[in-house]
From Swiss-Prot:
Compartment(s): Nucleus
Residue span of region Disordered: 107-148, 160-186, 343-398, 525-564, 642-684, 851-915, 1032-1060, 1079-1116, 1154-1180, 1205-1236
Organism: Drosophila melanogaster
Its biological purpose: Dose-limiting factor in position-effect variegation, the inactivation in some cells of a gene translocated next to heterochromatin. It could play a role in chromosome condensation.
Bias (Basic and acidic residues) ranges: 343-354, 851-860, 879-897
Annotated ranges, domain BESS: 987-1026
Biased composition regions of type Acidic residues, renumbered to the chain: 164-175, 553-563, 657-679
Listed name of the protein: Protein suppressor of variegation 3-7
Originating gene: Su(var)3-7
Biased composition (Low complexity): 543-552, 1032-1055, 1206-1224
GO cellular component terms attached to this protein's record: cytoplasm; heterochromatin; nucleus; pericentric heterochromatin
Length: 1250
């Protein structure tokens, strides 16, 4: 305790003595203390007198704890750490509260006040005047690392100002280091004490225990989270917003003290009724917010005249010049707005407006007096305005300096009663907004007028616009830019001076009309007063009433700017022209040509008369002087002059001019280019080019545009004979071109002229003339329409004739070429059976191709072989049949998936079928001499459209089953001898017929081709049956004996059939062809009763019979076992195919009905088609017993055959002969009750090709 009290006494002594603000902890003198460094602080450091330093050699440990840990920092006697060092303050802890020597000095309480009182009260250093108003960073940021100097580069302590050190923490740090006696003492500082130190160091901090980690900023009136770290306080202290608010608040407090006097801290606490100084200061700061804001606004409004307060609270203000709202709390925001370009421009305009208004008043007063004293009054008025101008902000031109005596405002004349305010430059005679006058003063045109002032009545006032002087007297050159038009009546720029429509619209506008009327009234008043004649233009003095409208440039402004006129006419121009040293360089304006327009792509300029393109200005100037251009312009003017001769000759001239312009377009090859304005006379729209006559006369000959397209066609068909319309056209403004046969959008006649100049229309018109379709150029409307129709028909006919001639020429060169019936741009190669485009390149390429050559050689070889060989051997025929049957075979999946109505067939099969149809048609063309017979055959082939895919599929299925049974029964010896097949007949015309019809069938769609083949097969089958019925003489059945016997329980019931009518005699096709069928007697009713079960027949040993063999598809095959084993010697019979009693035909139309459905490739049981219940019979030979054949296939795995008894007179020889010459082919169809009925037929073609 004694040591602590001694340390406190030493600290008190150091506190009383200002020279001992900072003491060294070492006993060495200043000269020998090489480790002491200069503290880089704003307040500076204090030099400690060595006589007052206690020599303490022991080191002292100061533990400054923070919330993060309890690590103690040991301060050696050779080091002087600071409390604000981050590495030290982070280890401070408030759990321990030992006595700290520098606490009393930090609280600055030498009078030992009571503990209950606030330690911050009555602190001399907390006076408002003594508060820090610094704007630079505080000392903590610089002193935090000032002691860490291992290189010894910092300066030593030499000079110290006692008044500069205000860092209480540094002072306490040094005093604590120097006041320690016991080196082992540990010093810790609680959190509350640390907040007191921070509040002492930064006067703007207010903190209570209830605030936690938050600190209240007195200057900013906000709470900040410092998180018990001094670096966060330091960061807020150096912010710009805090520093500016600090300046404002200290100024506010100073003004409060001057008006009310200083208030002590106790008075503040008593005022708010609290014992806490911090709480009282917070409440006081909140209560004076409005007063502080008003104080700031007074200062801001005094500093910035352009600023005005827009709201009673807050810091949002408005710029009265720019009318912009902004936040003006901080100085950089206000300075930034002051330096903006818009604010500076508005400020200059405002200053110039003020000066011009004052000068205008002084000038107008001087004009009312006598004319002799005008100069003296001007001199007297100048000194009065001078002081005001000297006080105003000088106007600085952006493009250079301006002389002090040069005031651009003298050329500005305000136009009254305008909002926004408009002004007029009296030098350039142009109107603009008041805010644009300064920019106008910097333009080249204005500078050029200043350097070389032009007289009012100069001949170049119109410039390049002189060509429109007769039509538009008000159009002159713009004073600023002569290349731009200018309306002298409305006093405004006219940007579209080269457009006739724009000039016309402006001349008819209400504004222009009113300005012209007011100008005429002003001229009349001026002439009555004797003031209007002095300003007349020499060029415009001899003009008519239209020319007088351009004289209002000066007379309109005689009332308000006579001072500018006197100055300009008197001494202003001469003085400026003589005293102005600066001359601006003026660039020559771009010359405009009235005949210049743009192309369709809007990229290239062309001459609308000559259709010549331009890429530079020199070419335009040369073209204007060319003889060709001059000639065409004269022709155009002549056509325009003819427009006023009357309505009788108007249509005729327009038609001639139209033809002339079209011929010129064709001559120069620029038909596709479109001019900006039509070269034709679009009199119905009023878009007439520049002409010399008055436009009022032209309005007498303008035809009104009808509202309907029919009316437009009636009006325009004299000029456009190809024009027509559709009665059923629903769209508006759509016409019809009879020559191009297209619909056109024609809102006006200009669009018709555009279409008339298109390349397609011109080409068709040339073709029409070339082929003899010359329309008569008469005014008669009916004759024009008739001639147009005839020309169109002849053009179409000529096109077809040309197509035929070109095809004939190609066929003469390429014998293999055939025209395509569907597309005139393609052809067909009959050798390769391919489709080619009619192009010379492709035709040559195909003719020289290897594939074409090989196909051609193969065709020649086949033709030679067919001509030399009279017959074909049976073996080759059988091989060909076998090869064809192998090619026709398809997989089981394809056949099962295939449906009756499906059209998807294999590509090879479809191509083969179409080739067969083409061969048939080609044979018909070659054999038939007459065209009618040829067309009838083609129609017959096309009408036979039905698919036979189902029939062929089922027949092949039965054939496969037969082959399987024959292979299983191969050990059985054959019992039926098969005679050799007859040699086929030589090739005849029917083969050629089928060869020619195949290409035609190929060209058909797949579904139509399949249906056609089916119908062809159906027709051939019916013809074959009729031929067999006609050629049948007497039945000669052959009985095949078998060793097997029927059981006693089995009975055979003959089936009687009604006689069938005999067909008419027909030409015999294959009279010598014979076929045989295998028939077995059985009950016919079993097939109709849907008995699908196989008959149970007791098996008996075969005693000596051999298996019967038949020819199926050209090959000898054994009879299936299930057929042979149920036949006896007197029941197994092979009948002649020609015998009609053994033939039963099922109509094929019943097999191809649309009501059938496909179930796994077979007919469903619910089909509606029925087969006849009784077979056909022919009683011509006297045979009353009919033979019935019926084969029912059940699930493709079994067959059931029934036979009937035939007379015993049938000869075996005929049966054997007929069996060997036939190929049984089975065809199936549904019975009446839905079961499957399979029939046999023969289709023998000895001349079939592979």
């Amino acid at each position: 305790m004694d040591r602590d009290s001694s340390m406190q006494a030493k600290n008190l002594d150091a506190q009383c003595n200002p020279d001992l603000k900072m003491a060294s902890a070492n006993s060495e003198t200043l000269a020998s203390a090489t480790h002491e460094l200069k503290i880089m602080d704003v307040e500076g450091g204090a030099l400690v007198d060595p006589d007052h330093i206690e020599e303490v050699e022991t080191s002292m440990v100061i533990v400054v704890d923070d919330d993060d840990g309890d690590v103690a920092m040991v301060v050696e006697e050779d080091k002087h750490p600071m409390r604000d060092d981050p590495c030290i303050e982070d280890i401070m802890d408030d759990e321990h509260a030992p006595l700290v020597a520098e606490l009393q000095s930090a609280l600055n309480n030498p009078d030992d006040k009571q503990a209950s009182e606030d330690p911050l009260l009555e602190d001399q250093e907390r006076e408002p005047d003594a508060m820090s108003t610094k704007t630079e960073p505080s000392s903590d940021a610089e002193s935090s690392h000032s002691y860490h100097d291992p290189m010894g580069l910092l300066e030593r302590i030499e000079i110290h100002d006692p008044g500069d050190s205000q860092d209480d923490d540094d002072e306490d740090d040094e005093s604590s280091n120097g006041g320690g006696v016991d080196g082992g003492m540990r010093r810790k500082m609680p959190r509350a004490q640390r907040w007191l130190l921070w509040m002492k160091r930064w006067p703007w901090i207010l903190h209570e225990d209830s605030d936690g980690t938050l600190a209240f900023c007195l200057y900013c009136n906000i709470s900040i989270n410092v998180n018990n770290r001094s670096r966060h306080i330091q960061q807020h202290n150096v912010s710009l917003s805090h520093q500016e608010r600090e300046c404002n608040y200290l100024a506010f407090k100073k003004s409060e003290e001057e008006t009310r006097g200083a208030i002590s801290d106790n008075e503040i606490k008593h005022e708010f009724g609290t014992k806490s100084y911090v709480a009282a200061m917070k409440q006081k700061r909140i209560s004076e917010t409005e007063a502080f804001n008003n104080f700031n606004w007074l200062r801001w409004l005094r500093w910035h005249p352009w600023l005005e307060r827009s709201m009673p609270t807050g810091t949002i203000g408005t710029c009265r010049i720019c009318s912009v709202r902004m936040n003006v709390e901080f100085v950089y925001l206000r300075k930034r707005h002051e330096t903006t370009k818009g604010h500076m421009e508005a400020l200059r305009n405002l200053d110039s407006d003020k000066r011009s208004r004052k000068r205008k008043r002084s000038k107008s007063n001087s004009v009312t007096n006598s004319g002799g004293d005008e100069a003296e009054r001007e001199k007297e008025s100048e000194p009065e305005v001078g002081p005001e101008d000297a006080q105003d902000t000088p106007v600085v031109m952006m493009n250079g300096d301006v002389d002090s005596g040069d005031d651009p405002g003298k050329w500005c004349a305000l136009i009254p009663d305008t909002n926004p305010q408009q002004c007029r430059c009296t030098l350039c005679n142009c109107t603009m907004a008041i805010t644009s006058f300064l920019r106008h003063c910097k333009t080249r045109a204005h500078c050029h007028m200043l350097s070389t002032p032009a007289e009012k009545g100069s001949s170049d006032i119109r410039g390049i616009w002189a060509v429109f002087a007769d039509m538009h007297p008000w159009l002159i050159a713009d004073p600023e830019d002569p290349s731009i038009g200018y309306c002298s009546v409305c006093r405004k720029r006219f940007m579209y001076g080269n457009s006739e429509i724009k000039r016309k619209n402006h001349e008819k506008s209400e504004k222009h009309t009113l300005a012209l009327a007011s100008a005429k009234a002003g001229i009349e008043v001026g002439s009555a007063d004797g003031r209007g004649g002095d300003n007349m233009d020499e060029e415009e003095a001899a003009a008519s009433d239209q020319a007088q409208s351009s004289q209002t440039d000066d007379s309109e402004d005689n009332d308000d700017d006579n001072w500018s006129e006197i100055q300009k006419l008197g001494k202003g121009f001469a003085h400026k022209s003589s005293s102005e040293p600066r001359k601006a360089t003026v660039r020559a304006g771009v010359r405009f040509y009235p005949w210049l327009c743009y192309s369709k792509d809007r990229k290239t300029q062309i001459c609308k008369f000559c259709r010549v393109r331009f890429h530079n200005e020199a070419a335009k100037a040369r073209h204007e002087l060319s003889a060709r251009h001059v000639k065409l312009v004269k022709q155009f003017k002549m056509r325009q002059a003819k427009l006023h001769q009357g309505t009788n000759t108007q249509t005729k001239h327009n038609a001639q001019d139209d033809e002339e312009s079209q011929e010129q377009d064709e001559e120069y090859g620029e038909e596709e280019e479109d001019a900006e304005e039509d070269s034709q006379s679009n009199f119905d729209l009023g878009t007439v080019q520049a002409r010399k006559t008055a436009r009022a006369d032209n309005k007498l000959f303008v035809k009104p545009i009808p509202a309907t397209m029919k009316g437009k066609v009636m009006v325009w068909k004299g000029r456009f004979p190809w024009l027509s319309y559709k009665k059923n056209e629903q769209r508006g403004n759509y016409a019809w071109c009879k020559l191009c046969e297209v619909s056109l959008y024609l809102p006006s006649s200009k669009w018709a002229s555009k279409h008339q100049r298109t390349s397609r229309h011109i080409r068709l018109r040339i073709d029409r003339k070339r082929n003899g379709g010359n329309p008569l150029k008469t005014s008669n409307k009916n004759s024009g329409e008739i001639s147009t129709v005839v020309a169109t028909a002849s053009a179409l006919a000529s096109a077809e004739a040309r197509q035929k001639a070109a095809m004939a020429e190609l066929q003469a060169k390429y014998d293999w070429l055939d025209p395509d019936a569907n597309d005139e741009n393609h052809c067909h190669c009959r050798v390769c059976d391919s489709r080619l485009p009619i192009k010379v390149f492709y035709l040559r390429q195909h003719d020289a191709s290897r594939k074409h050559v090989e196909n051609k050689e193969r065709q020649r070889a086949n033709a030679a072989a067919a001509a030399n060989a009279p017959s074909v051997s049976p073996t080759s025929t059988v091989d060909a049949e076998r090869q064809e049957s192998g090619m026709d075979k398809e997989s089981e999946n394809d056949m099962s998936v295939r449906s009756d109505g499906s059209t998807a067939e294999p590509l090879a099969k479809r191509s083969r079928r179409s080739m067969e149809v083409r061969r048939i048609i080609r044979a018909l063309r070659d054999s038939m001499g007459k065209r009618q017979e040829e067309r009838s055959q083609m129609d017959m082939a096309r009408d036979m459209i039905c698919s036979s895919f189902d029939i062929v599929t089922r027949l092949r299925t039965l054939e496969r089953e037969s082959v399987a049974h024959n292979e299983s029964m191969a050990q059985a010896p054959p019992s039926v001898t098969v005679s050799p097949i007859k040699p086929p007949e030589p090739r005849h015309v029917m083969d050629l017929f089928f060869d020619s019809i195949s290409p035609t069938m190929k060209s058909l769609p797949p579904d139509l081709a399949a249906e056609g083949k089916s119908k062809i097969m159906q027709l051939v089958c019916s013809l074959e049956l009729r031929a067999m019925q006609r050629n049948a003489t007497t039945p000669t059945p052959a009985t095949v004996s078998a060793s097997s016997k029927w059981p006693s329980s089995t009975t055979v019931t003959p089936v009687k059939t009604p006689p069938a009518p005999i067909s008419a005699p027909l030409a015999s096709v294959d009279a010598d062809l014979h076929s045989s069928v295998v028939t077995t007697p059985h009950e016919y009713n079993n097939g109709q009763n849907n008995n699908n079960d196989k008959e149970t027949v007791p098996k008996e040993p075969v005693t000596g019979a051999s298996s019967a063999q038949v020819t199926i598809n050209g090959s000898a095959k054994d009879l299936p076992e299930n057929i042979r084993r149920i036949l006896t010697s007197n029941q197994t019979q092979v009948t002649n195919r020609l015998e009609t009693d053994s033939v039963r035909c099922v109509p094929l139309d019943k097999l191809t009905t649309q009501s059938r459905t496909n179930v796994n490739g077979r007919l469903s049981q619910g089909g509606t088609s029925e087969a006849p219940s009784t077979p056909q019979a022919d009683l011509s030979n006297g045979n009353t017993l009919a033979m019935i054949r019926q084969i029912r296939v059940n699930n493709n795995n079994s067959s059931k055959i029934t036979v009937t008894n035939t007379p015993q007179m049938q000869q075996p020889q005929q049966a054997q002969a007929s069996i060997t010459s036939s190929t049984p082919i089975m065809r199936g169809g549904p019975s009446s009750n839905g079961c499957q009925i399979t029939t046999f037929r023969t289709m023998v073609n000895h001349n079939r090709r592979p």
